[in-house]
Amino acid sequence: MKVFSAVLIILFVCSMIIGISEGKEIPVKCKHSGQCLQPCKDAGMRFGKCMNGKCNCTPK
């Protein structure tokens, strides 16, 4: 059971790293994630969130 939990955690961390690397930052300033939805869709990405005052878009 401990091995299964360790493998599950490793897979979760790897998927987070892959998801972050696929994203791209666009030059749109924001204060909350709701402001990023339309600019990210216009950039050809599906989702967006506000990180450090700029929109970060991801394809998933």
UniProtKB/Swiss-Prot annotation:
Domain remark text: Has the structural arrangement of an alpha-helix connected to antiparallel beta-sheets by disulfide bonds (CS-alpha/beta).
Domain of life, source organism: Eukaryota
Tissue-specific expression: Expressed by the venom gland.
Keywords: Disulfide bond, Ion channel impairing toxin, Potassium channel impairing toxin, Secreted, Signal, Toxin
Signal sequence range: 1-23
Pfam families: Toxin_2 (PF00451)
PROSITE patterns (alphabetical): SCORP_SHORT_TOXIN (PS01138)
GO terms assigned for molecular function: ion channel inhibitor activity; potassium channel regulator activity; toxin activity
Similarity annotation: Belongs to the short scorpion toxin superfamily. Potassium channel inhibitor family. Alpha-KTx 03 subfamily.
Disulphide connectivity of cysteines: C30-C50, C36-C55, C40-C57
Biological role: Potassium channel inhibitor.
Annotated compartments: Secreted
Keyword Signal: yes
Protein name per Swiss-Prot or TrEMBL: Potassium channel toxin alpha-KTx 3.16
Gene Ontology CC annotations of this record: extracellular region
